[in-house]
Amino acid sequence: MSKVKDKAIVSAAQASTAYSQIDSFSHLYDRGGNLTVNGKPSYTVDQAATQLLRDGAAYRDFDGNGKIDLTYTFLTSATQSTMNKHGISGFSQFNTQQKAQAALAMQSWADVANVTFTEKASGGDGHMTFGNYSSGQDGAAAFAYLPGTGAGYDGTSWYLTNNSYTPNKTPDLNNYGRQTLTHEIGHTLGLAHPGDYNAGNGNPTYNDATYGQDTRGYSLMSYWSESNTNQNFS
């Protein structure tokens, strides 16, 4: 066989491989129907959204301006009664970096949802607060409440900071502290986890996911790494 034909065959093989790769990539995010992911059902975007909103928790547009306007404050103190209510102890204020990153995390939600955030002592369609704790809640890295939980709970989110757990002290772009802030704010807006699991309730893993796309590759409300769905955001 001549070198010309050799090269032609190699070129054809390379083209075939390239087509296969492109075709595979073009179907990478196909969802729903009878598709499965890791042996689990594949949910469409609408099905996944319904899963996140299954608790029916949401703020109301009280002034009828067509959007949800929320106010927020960074707590400077917390009474013992408040700490007891949440099952935590060791209050501390957000540091400068936490405040700046919380504002950016809120902006990331405002960029994709019909919601605004204004730092103000009260008012709006709902009010959010941020604070740190050093122990309690079975060692959860953070926790927050869905709208409608009740007075003293709605809009509140708390973040673990102590000598043994430090990520929340230094949140930044692409690190776990920033991810935690954005995740917990998602809860205060009314979003649940994609599946029925929670920190402190046993030791859930991706095996407990209801559907295949329940990873951070598709929603930051998930507990599970995007690596479970063959993605890498690092």
Where are the regions that the model predicts?
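Short conserved micro-motifs at the rims of enzyme active sites and ligand-binding pockets
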Residues: 83-85, 230-234
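Disordered inhibitory propeptide/activation segment of secreted metzincin zinc metalloprotease zymogens
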Residues: 1-94
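Metzincin-family zinc-dependent endopeptidase catalytic domain
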Residues: 27-65, 97-216, 223-232
